[in-house]
Regions:
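Residue-level recognition of oxygen-bearing side chains
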Residues: 45, 109, 150, 178-179
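Active-site/ligand-binding-proximal alpha/beta "capping" segment
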Residues: 120-157, 164-168
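Structured adenosyl-cofactor binding patch, chiefly the S-adenosyl-L-methionine
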Residues: 153-194
Length: 194
């Protein structure tokens, strides 16, 4: 991505004309290519998780439908939410100085999303493994945390069958919006650019 310098030539009530005078290549993207799956969450939780994930360098974000997803959206409300989340992503990019806007993928069911993963991590408070015990990923990473109420045993088993590594983030159970942020920060520290 680039930042551009421009000279303003004219302004109107609802317009502006400018000429680009320089392109400044930004090299602030994470070496980790993380695709975050976020189960639909109520209130501001989804916004918070998306905002912080962008600040922490994710490449793609996919809203997920899980068995315990509390939020149910019809197609009209979903489109409005997608537009809102895209604006959250853009604002987070502006705040943290990213020139590349992470992709916001369409809503998917968890099983469908997990099939595209070559290296996956499922945050599971029941698991005994930590991120430190995993080898640094040589490919894109799919990361998923549970919704309010957590992933079901069937969902965790399905993810493991798809090759996902189960990871516990300490001894405490984290909220649905906190868990991905904590995991992303730890991943950047272990394998990324922190």
């Amino acid at each position: 991505g680039c930042d551009y310098s421009a000279e303003i030539h004219s302004t109107g009530r609802h317009s502006l004309r400018a000429r680009v005078v320089a392109c400044h290549l930004l090299e602030n993207e994470s070496p980790l290519r993380i695709h975050l799956g976020i189960p639909l969450a109520k209130g501001q939780r989804m916004d918070y998780a998306i905002q912080k994930a962008v600040e922490l360098g994710v490449e793609k974000i996919t809203p997920l439908r899980t068995e315990r997803s509390v939020v149910k959206l019809d197609s009209k409300r979903l489109e409005g939410k997608r537009e809102h989340w895209h604006q959250v992503i853009i604002a987070a990019c502006e705040q943290c100085g990213r020139a590349r806007v992470p992709a916001l993928e369409p809503l998917q069911a968890l099983p469908e999303w997990s099939q595209a993963a070559r290296f996956g991590i499922v945050l599971d408070p029941e698991d005994a493994n930590s991120l430190r015990e995993l080898q640094p990923p040589a490919t894109d990473v799919h990361l998923v945390a549970g919704p309010e109420g957590g992933l079901t045993g069937r969902e965790v088993a399905m993810l493991r069958a798809a090759g996902f590594h189960g990871v516990r983030l300490g001894r405490r159970i984290l909220r649905t919006e906190t868990a991905p942020v904590a995991a992303l920060a730890a991943m950047q520290l272990l394998w990324g650019d922190f």
